[in-house]
Amino acid sequence: EIRQVKLLTPKGIELYLELEEIMRKKSEVSCAVRKYSGDDPDVTNGILVYATVQKVEKKSKINSENSVDLSEKINLDGGIGIGRVTKPGLEQKIGQAAINKVPRRMICEAVEEVCRKYEYTGNLQVRLSVPEGAEVAKKTFNPRLGIEGGISILGTTGIVEPMSEKALTDTIYLEMKMLKENG
């Protein structure tokens, strides 16, 4: 049984992540990893982030206007505790899960790698969820940015960088952009 996965970050750093709460069903598997924020005072530190991957016969059965096609055969959406975009100005369309492009790309690459390894050519639905996400999100900028119902899945490097002046400046810039977009 797989208890650990290797993840190559966009910075080229290999991480070995312990899997928790592994559940298998006939055509579905889910597991969680615990978020580690290092020295960063991140309110999401220690929470469990779940991924559920489900085999589906026809991709058209899994698409909703709010899900995102990662590839021809892989579809992604957010579940419980993943915020939804409610205002224009972010990377995602209104209604979509607040999962930014770098994490989406990382998820797609990881799922495609497993599909190649096991010679699976069918369609897959990937759903991320964070049971504590709605409560934790209240302590973030998400409500001010128009992200409701949970946390956002962010990142550019795959590693949590300690809070910096640049991170704060980027957050303020994004909030100003949102205010401009929304009058």
Predicted segments with their positions:
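Generic N-terminal targeting/processing segments that precede catalytic cores or assembly contacts
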Residues: 1-145
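Glycine-rich anion/phosphate-binding loop at the beta-strand->alpha-helix junction
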Residues: 131, 135-136, 142-183
